[in-house]
């Protein structure tokens, strides 16, 4: 019986000894693994958690967080992804390789790194050094990125010839715009890929299409010393060459327009458009300083009568129908007069347009149209449309008339009607080609258009074109010497009140088409369109 008790006691003692030894082993064993610590460290880096990174590192430097902030700012890092590979151990240390993917402005930079680890108080810790960021990074160094921009592409005419130099007319230079070297402040505002001295577009097409023209820079990730001198290239991205911006400008037509404006003593502008597709062939301003051809706004005067004439033809009035053209007419309380010297009396509708009879148009507008019908015709020819030729322009504006008298005045281009050479050249182009096309100046890249093309009734278009030819052959422009086959319309637009009993000052207009070229000319304060603007059109057409 004693033996059984003894053996039981011995057995119990053995269990106690083994239990104590097992507990000591558990207390002395190193916690975790090098891979687990590396994963925690890399995860903290990815979420920009410097406190957590310190917790996984052995004696981290005081500027640990600053080192990683320098990395983010220097490279423009927006995202970090890093994952550990297979660990290896030697003695009391371990190495864990990692894969890093840093999202930079130019793309994702992929590289391989490694972390060294050792145990400290039975825990694996990262032995931090600059090599923990990148294997080629050493004390006193940092990573940065440099950019080299490609040669800037060109703004070119329809035939591919450059138009972004100083050898083109000032009107073209205004549209193309300017470039300039960035200041340090401007470069910082644009982002890390820009530096002081880089060339960027400042205005016009150069500014709007800057990214296309500039291309993308070649970027090099480099190790740099404390003075920011490059030590070694460790990564990079290939840049892309800029691409030309192609315009519809026709150099020959542009030269003809510019020459036609030479010698003018008052501000003058002209636009030429190809009727078949709405492409802008020429833009000319004299003098320079303000792009009045595209951005100016003026009452169109009697040139707008072609729009009203189309609305009247659509209402059933025929070119051969007889209309009244009194010297004066009272329409809704508004007394309408004709310009001095204009023929009056009964005449055909064609003659009323050819002679530019204000009263005939006012009376027929009152009789046959309403604000909706007149506005519909204006919209068909591009008024009130959101046009975008590829540069900043002012579209024609035709507010819907609110009274009979206002409609009568609006019908011959006064009141609140506003236009410029671009919008009236577009009207002429619509009549010449049968469709009003949203004007286009930049053809490549293609600019999205909100404006919709307006298709004219073919019979009415033909009738209106014939009526406009009568303006040149027998009407107000018969003495301008325009080439045979020209169709057009003169305009004399009041823009202020007369003083001391004198007639109000007027802008001089002429718009029309010949072949596949439509155009409009306006001379500010030029008086009568037949005497001032039509001769400019003659010089232009003769030079083509």
Residue ranges of predicted features:
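Hydrophobic alpha-helical transmembrane signal-anchor segments
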Residues: 2-24, 91-97, 116, 123-126
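Beta-lactam-recognizing serine transpeptidase/beta-lactamase-like catalytic domain environment
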Residues: 232, 268-297, 311-525, 529
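Soluble non-cytosolic domains of exported or imported proteins
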Residues: 32-36, 47-48, 59-62, 150, ...
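Short solvent-exposed beta->alpha transition segments
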Residues: 30-36, 40, 47-97
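Short regulatory alpha-helical segment in sensory/regulatory domains of signaling proteins that mediates
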Residues: 42-46, 72, 261-262, 382
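C-terminal region of N-terminal signal peptides and the immediate post-cleavage residues
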Residues: 4-11, 17-50, 436
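Extracytoplasmic/periplasmic proteins that interact with beta-lactams or build/remodel peptidoglycan
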Residues: 73-269, 507
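Solvent-exposed, polar/charged alpha-helical surfaces in well-ordered, non-transmembrane soluble domains
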Residues: 35-43, 47, 51, 55, ...
């Amino acid at each position: 019986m004693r033996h059984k008790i003894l053996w039981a006691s011995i057995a119990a003692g053995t269990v106690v000894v083994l239990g104590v030894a097992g507990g000591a082993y558990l207390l002395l064993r190193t916690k975790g693994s090098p891979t687990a610590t590396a994963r925690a460290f890399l995860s903290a880096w990815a979420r920009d958690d410097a406190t957590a990174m310190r917790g996984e590192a052995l004696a981290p430097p005081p500027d640990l967080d600053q080192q990683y902030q320098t990395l983010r700012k220097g490279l423009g890092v927006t995202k970090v992804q890093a994952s550990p590979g297979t660990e290896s151990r030697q003695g009391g240390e371990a190495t864990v390789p990692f894969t890093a993917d840093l999202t930079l402005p130019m793309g994702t930079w992929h590289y391989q790194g490694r972390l060294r680890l050792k145990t400290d108080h039975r825990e694996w810790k990262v032995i931090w050094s600059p090599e923990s960021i990148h294997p080629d990074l050493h004390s006193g160094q940092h990573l940065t990125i440099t950019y080299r921009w490609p040669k800037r592409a060109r703004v070119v005419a329809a035939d591919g010839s450059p138009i972004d130099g100083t050898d083109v007319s000032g009107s073209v230079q205004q549209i193309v715009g300017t470039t300039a070297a960035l200041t340090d402040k401007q470069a910082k505002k644009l982002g890390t890929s820009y530096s002081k001295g880089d060339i960027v577009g400042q205005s016009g097409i150069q500014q709007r299409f800057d990214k296309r023209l500039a291309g993308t820079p070649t970027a090099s990730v480099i190790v740099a010393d404390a003075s920011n001198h490059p030590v070694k290239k460790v990564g990079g991205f290939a840049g892309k060459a800029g691409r030309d911006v192609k315009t519809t400008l026709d150099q020959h037509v542009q030269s003809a327009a510019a020459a036609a404006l030479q010698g003018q003593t008052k501000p003058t502008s002209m636009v030429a458009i190809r009727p078949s597709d709405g492409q802008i062939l020429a833009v000319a301003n004299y003098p320079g300083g303000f792009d009045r051809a595209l951005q100016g706004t003026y009452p169109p005067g009697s040139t707008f009568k072609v729009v009203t004439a189309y609305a009247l033809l659509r209402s059933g009035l025929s070119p051969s129908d007889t209309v009244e053209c009194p010297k004066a007419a009272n329409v809704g309380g508004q007394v309408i007069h004709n310009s001095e010297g204009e023929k009056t009396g009964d005449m055909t509708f064609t003659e009323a347009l050819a002679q530019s009879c204000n009263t005939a148009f006012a009376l027929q507008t009152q009789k046959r149209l309403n604000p909706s019908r007149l506005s519909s015709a204006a919209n068909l020819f591009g008024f009130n449309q959101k046009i975008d030729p590829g540069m900043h322009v002012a579209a024609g504006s035709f507010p819907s008339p609110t009274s009979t008298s206002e409609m009568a005045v609006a019908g011959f281009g006064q009141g609140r009607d506003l236009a410029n050479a671009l919008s009236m050249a577009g009207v002429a182009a619509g009549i010449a080609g049968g469709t009003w096309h949203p004007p286009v100046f930049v053809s490549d890249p293609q600019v999205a258009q909100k404006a919709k093309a307006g298709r004219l009734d073919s019979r009415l278009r033909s009738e209106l074109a014939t009526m406009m030819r009568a303006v040149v052959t027998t009407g107000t422009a018969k003495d301008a010497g325009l080439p045979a086959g020209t169709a057009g319309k003169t305009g004399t637009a009041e823009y202020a009140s007369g003083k001391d009993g004198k007639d109000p000052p007027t802008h001089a207009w002429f718009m029309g088409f010949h072949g596949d070229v439509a155009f409009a000319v306006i001379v500010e304060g030029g008086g009568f369109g037949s005497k001032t603007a039509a001769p400019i059109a003659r010089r232009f057409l003769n030079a083509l």
